[in-house]
Amino acid sequence: MASTVVAVGLTIAAAGFAGRYALQAMKHMEPQVKQVFQSLPKTAFSGGYYRGGFEPKMTKREAALILGVSPTANKAKIRDAHRRIMLLNHPDKGGSPYIAAKINEAKDLLEGQAKK
């Protein structure tokens, strides 16, 4: 019983010393870490999606971003992208009616300008 208490006490003391050493080491490395983060490109942390709301009048570029296709995509690719996105965002399955309307508007805009 006494040896267990001593072992636990030594373990706690060792953890305390290790934590103190780690904090001191981090203080010395702080300028280097800041320099590394400043040298990274700003887009590294921006995420992989378009940040911004919808434009008042939908453009071809915005429609392509919504559907995830090229602005010059053919009708088959536009239909496939529309179907895939609507399966995920359909209002009958808990999706937003506003988002569904924007997806449909994007499909209509791109299909009107796409080649067969």
Swiss-Prot record:
Membrane topology value: Single-pass membrane protein
Residues bearing PTM Phosphoserine: 39, 70
Annotated J domain residues: 62-116
Domain of life (superkingdom): Eukaryota
Main localization (coarse): mitochondrion
Annotated keywords: Acetylation, Chaperone, Membrane, Mitochondrion, Mitochondrion inner membrane, Phosphoprotein, Protein transport, Translocation, Transmembrane, Transmembrane helix, Transport
N-acetylalanine: residues carrying this PTM: 2
Transmembrane segments: 4-24
GO MF annotations in UniProt: ATPase activator activity
InterPro entries named in the record: DnaJ_domain, J_dom_sf
Listed GO CC annotations: inner mitochondrial membrane protein complex; matrix side of mitochondrial inner membrane; PAM complex, Tim23 associated import motor
Mitochondrial intermembrane side: 2-3
Mitochondrial matrix side: 25-116
Quaternary structure (record): Interacts with PHB2; the interaction associates DNAJC19 with the prohibitin complex. Interacts with TIMM16/PAM16. May be a component of the PAM complex at least composed of a mitochondrial HSP70 protein, GRPEL1 or GRPEL2, TIMM44, TIMM16/PAM16 and TIMM14/DNAJC19.
Protein name: Mitochondrial import inner membrane translocase subunit TIM14
Organism: Bos taurus (Bovine)
Lineage, highest ranks first: Eukaryota, Metazoa, Chordata, Craniata, Vertebrata
